[in-house]
């Protein structure tokens, strides 16, 4: 399957990685990433519920905060965790030693220059990466 045909590739949120890397990460990297995220600087865990199953999931991500806004770059496209949080309207995240509740999730389309985003997320958005944004409750 080509990257352009992958379900994660959607308008405004292009998938930047090749499909083989996506599959490799899901199968081998993700199972060890969540336990390591608890002790690795720069990586955090976002907790969300499945939109169909209702099951609780944890996903390792890199998040950036500016004020009461959290931003996460979507180089993998519109993945299942993003779809789950958009459907639920909320999620929990641990940033540093603080557990935070996220509300009002939304996606900033690739190519957007939004000054309210953290610097790293703003640079990624300008370079063609979609950004997941949510407010801290």
Where do the protein language model's features map onto the residues?
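Short, structured beta-strand-loop surface elements
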Residues: 6, 76-137
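Alpha-helical membrane-targeting segments
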Residues: 3-44, 83, 119-129
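Short, functional N-terminal and low-complexity linear motifs
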Residues: 12-13, 48-53, 83-87
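Short beta-strand segments
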Residues: 41-74
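A subset of signal/propeptide-processing and intrinsically disordered low-complexity segments
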Residues: 1, 17, 96-99
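Solvent-exposed, flexible loop/coil residues
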Residues: 28, 32, 36, 61, ...
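Short, flexible segments with low predicted structural confidence
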Residues: 25-26, 56-57, 113
